Amino acid sequence: MLSQTNDAFFTRSLADSDPEIFGAIEKELGRQRHEIELIASENIVSRAVLEAQGSIMTNKYAEGYPGKRYYGGCQYVDIAEALAIERAKKLFGVNFANVQPNSGSQMNQAVFLALLQPGDTFMGLDLNSGGHLTHGSPVNMSGKWFNVVSYGVREDDHLLDMDEVARKAREQKPKLIIAGGTAYSRIWDWKRFREIADEVGAWLMVDMAHIAGLVAGGQHPSPFPHCHVATTTTHKSLRGPRGGMILTNDEEIAKKINSAVFPGLQGGPLMHVIAAKAVALGEALQPSFKDYAAQVVKNARTLAETLKANGLDIVSGGTDNHLMLVDLRKKNATGKRAEAALGRAYVTCNKNGIPFDPEKPFVTSGVRLGAPAGTTRGFKEAEFKEVGELIVEVLDGLKAANSDEGNAAVEAGVREKVIKLTDRFPMYGYM
């Protein structure tokens, strides 16, 4: 009897073992296949990445680092982590990489733990200007444990106010300055940030979670050699599994980072995720990834130009990377209402505050749109022009209806067009 139970444990499919979870996954697969994904922080991973993340590496505990584990039997997971480290170093041209952080928040926390003490002062981009929660938001640990000095964008053009950065740095003498964000669509001047950091004796940390794939693909300047340390997620524009990574050229910082990640913040790393990170980093080292990164930027610019041509304002006037913030006020819409209407039309995005937004954070005056997932799917400029026109069609219908319920007829018509478009670009056909 026990033998039969064991056989079932190792052989029963998910569909047989847990039909409720299987059903949810099947519905999510259908959603991803038929909807246009425009959330800037999302992407679509390869079959190889999926296979690595769903592998038997999930069974293995491996506290420590390759060659220095606190558990036995780590010789093969060591291979996976060593490959991830070496590929990360090669991809970004750095001397040290830690691939163990489980998330973007944890990678940033690890840098704080390595370089700061509670109560120290650091600077980061204000959340309302396109920063991240972990860059000092008062609701986040980073804003509770440290003295945070935020900088922002100029009100007239929504570009980074580097004069404000320099002035506040001189006044407040931060120990760390963070450059990088989640909703800033222009090129970052890493050199100027480093000059300011050096002037006040601060570390410069770059959070390139959103643009790492563009950096790797040659479409955005690298933060190295300007920054002391850089963090990035491995999903988003890198097209890997969800997780984090920390990079540096400084051996002393690398030692502090390693100690901060383990044992400072985490115990056993997720070896199946690290294996998948290695696969994604290997993919990003291929020549075709540069073509992908270039197409992402072309597609984002096409989408922004299409929306502008149809009467919408793009924050800062356009985009140099993979994303844009769309100011909806000319269409008399809020981000909350637009996100829901576009969702009903099978276009997925997220409501997002715009700089100096008069609306509440859960309502907002804008939406954030991104090109990475659609580009992975195979969309090029023609498809993103069509996507932009479909977005405008939904927003115009929403304006005409002037209701939270939206315009059912318009949304149904757009939904049919979206399905026709996505059917031309199938994904995961083997499933």
Curated annotation (Swiss-Prot):
Positions of (6S)-5,6,7,8-tetrahydrofolate binding: 127, 131-133, 252
UniProt site positions, description: Plays an important role in substrate specificity: 235
UniProt protein name: Serine hydroxymethyltransferase 1
Cited PANTHER family: SERINE HYDROXYMETHYLTRANSFERASE, SERINE HYDROXYMETHYLTRANSFERASE 1
Pathway assigned in UniProt: One-carbon metabolism; tetrahydrofolate interconversion; Amino-acid biosynthesis; glycine biosynthesis; glycine from L-serine: step 1/1
InterPro entries according to UniProt: PyrdxlP-dep_Trfase (IPR015424), PyrdxlP-dep_Trfase_major (IPR015421), PyrdxlP-dep_Trfase_small (IPR015422), Ser_HO-MeTrfase (IPR001085), Ser_HO-MeTrfase-like (IPR049943), Ser_HO-MeTrfase_PLP_BS (IPR019798), SHMT-like_dom (IPR039429)
GO BP, sorted A to Z: glycine biosynthetic process from serine; tetrahydrofolate interconversion
Record keyword Repeat present: no
Modified residues (N6-(pyridoxal phosphate)lysine): 236
Organism this protein belongs to: Rhizobium meliloti (strain 1021)
Family: Belongs to the SHMT family.
Entry-linked NCBIfam families: PRK00011.1
Quaternary state and interactors: Homodimer.
EC number(s) on file: 2.1.2.1
UniProt keyword terms in alphabetical order: Amino-acid biosynthesis, Cytoplasm, One-carbon metabolism, Pyridoxal phosphate, Transferase
